[in-house]
Regions:
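Multi-pass alpha-helical membrane architecture of UbiA-family
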Residues: 1-329
Length: 329
């Protein structure tokens, strides 16, 4: 019995729940959009999901990060032996094969429930997200492709959140929907860019030529400051082009400005401390900037929920990070 308890503790530790808000709130962007457009445009086809259904979707979205993280840890063992030597799978505290088996069983169950209880079509982004997650580690070896693949894997959560809610009217993809998906992709591609700084040494030795490894710390930290403006510039360009037609509330703009501040603060932290012991702890601000950006997008469709999620995400991302005192994990 003791070994099962120890395995469970190591498995949960490896799930790194402080990141779960990334997949959770990215997916809820899709749910919020579905609930917004259904009564206005598609009440004859689409159906507002029940509270029970939404809770299942939310549970799957938050679970998605941790379950898939087990596969990432296994595929990233060579660099993690340097970057994160105290992670359970690296130290042997977590049996890799058993952990992979557990994640596979859970994902199979999620697929089964999605097909038979949620919406069969939601299996498409679900399976796409799993495959993109598996492709992420190899993609890291090819510069910007790691960022591209990671961003797409999180964007699949947004698509899943939308399609899992209920019947979806055609067309599935419009310029407004694609614009929001692009912004979710961009936020996450930027987030993972900053995360590469803490992994510089291990990635370099393991042959993972991320952008930071390819161009070096000094050039990369300057690019980080420049790239922090990309999301806000992109959104303004998209909005001014008329791709987003929903009137934007004052609440959205306030959350948007706060998100821009978090993005700039993230860039400053990595510019000042790009590769030392403080770098790992800059991840909390980096993650907040990404997750709060997701919450701000929800503000386009539901500003009260967006405000709540923004505050909850900001508080609990920091709280969960603070529970992990060992930066080598």
């Amino acid at each position: 019995m003791k070994k099962y308890i120890e395995f469970t503790k190591a498995y949960v530790k490896s799930m790194r729940f402080y990141y779960a808000f990334i997949t959770g709130i990215a997916g809820w962007v899709g749910v919020s959009f579905y609930e917004y457009v259904t009564p206005i445009f598609y009440s004859d086809i689409q159906v507002i999901p029940s509270t029970e259904k939404k809770m299942i979707i939310l549970f799957f979205l938050f679970l998605a990060w941790g379950i898939n993280q087990i596969f990432n840890d296994y595929m990233g063992l060579p660099e993690d032996r340097i970057n994160a030597p105290n992670r359970p799978m690296v130290t042997g505290e977590l049996n890799a094969k058993a952990a992979l088996a557990v994640s596979t069983v859970i994902l199979t169950g999620v697929c089964f429930i999605t097909y038979y209880y949620l919406e069969p079509i939601a299996l498409i982004p679900l399976l796409a997200g799993i495959l993109l997650n598996l492709a992420y580690e190899p993609a890291k070896a090819y510069g910007i492709w790691g960022n591209v693949v990671y961003g797409l894997s999180i964007t699949s959560c947004t698509v899943f959140g939308f399609l899992a809610c209920g019947p979806a009217a055609q067309p599935l993809f419009t310029k407004e929907r694609i614009s929001i998906l692009f912004m979710v992709w961009l936020l996450n591609a930027l987030m993972t860019y900053f995360s590469y700084f803490k992994d510089y040494e291990g990635d370099k030795i393991a042959g993972k030529r991320t952008i930071v490894v390819k161009y070096g710390i000094e050039k990369s930290k300057v690019f980080g400051v420049i790239s922090a403006f990309f999301p806000s510039i992109s959104f303004i360009a998209i909005y001014m082009s008329g791709c987003i037609t929903v009137p934007l509330s004052t609440t959205f703009w306030i959350l948007g400005v706060l998100t821009v501040f978090l993005q700039m603060w993230t860039a400053c932290l990595y510019y000042v401390n790009p590769a030392d012991k403080k770098t790992a702890y800059s991840l909390a601000t980096n993650t907040r900037a990404c997750v709060c950006g997701h919450a701000a997008f929800i503000g386009i469709y539901n500003d009260q929920l967006a405000t709540l999620l923004f505050l909850v995400a900001y508080i609990f991302v920091g709280f969960l990070f603070d529970l992990h005192k060992n930066s080598n994990e």
